[in-house]
C-alpha cells in the first residue's frame, strides 16, 4: 500500500478558465476540485475508476452500488487566483457502514485558502435502497485512518 501522503495529499494548479471576471476562482469550481481530488486519491490508492463510477470506458460490469452526494459545503478563507499552486489535503471519514464524507483543505504556501466537504451515501444501483459501502471504498477509508487517532 502506498504512503497516505501519496494519495491523501494532492496538488492542483489553478487555470485561468476556472476564474471569474474578477480573476478569482468561481465558487462552483471548488466542488469540482473536491470530486476530482477524490477520484485521483482513489486511483493513486489503486482503485480503478470502473470499480466505482458507472460509464467508464471498457467497463466489464456496472457497479452494483452507487455513491451519490447527499451533502456538500464549501468555504473560501482567502481569494484563489489563476496560477496558484494549491495543495489539497483529503480527510476521509466513515460515518456509518453505508455513508462516508471527505473533508478537503486547500492550501497555498501552507495557508488554508478554502475548505470543502462532500458526503456520500451507498445505495444499490437497481433498487436505490441504502446498503453497505463497496469493499474498495471500505478499504480506502480504513487505510486513511492508519496513524490517525479517532475520537472515542
Swiss-Prot record:
Keywords: Hydrolase. GO terms for biological process: phylloquinone biosynthetic process. It holds the Pfam family 4HBT_2. It catalyses: 1,4-dihydroxy-2-naphthoyl-CoA + H2O = 1,4-dihydroxy-2-naphthoate + CoA + H(+). InterPro entries: DHNA_CoA_hydrolase (IPR022829), HotDog_dom_sf (IPR029069). The keyword Hydrolase applies. Coiled coil: none annotated. The keyword Mitochondrion does not apply. Catalyzes the hydrolysis of 1,4-dihydroxy-2-naphthoyl-CoA (DHNA-CoA) to 1,4-dihydroxy-2-naphthoate (DHNA), a reaction involved in phylloquinone (vitamin K1) biosynthesis. This is 1,4-dihydroxy-2-naphthoyl-CoA hydrolase. The lineage of its organism: Bacteria, Bacillati, Cyanobacteriota, Cyanophyceae, Synechococcales.
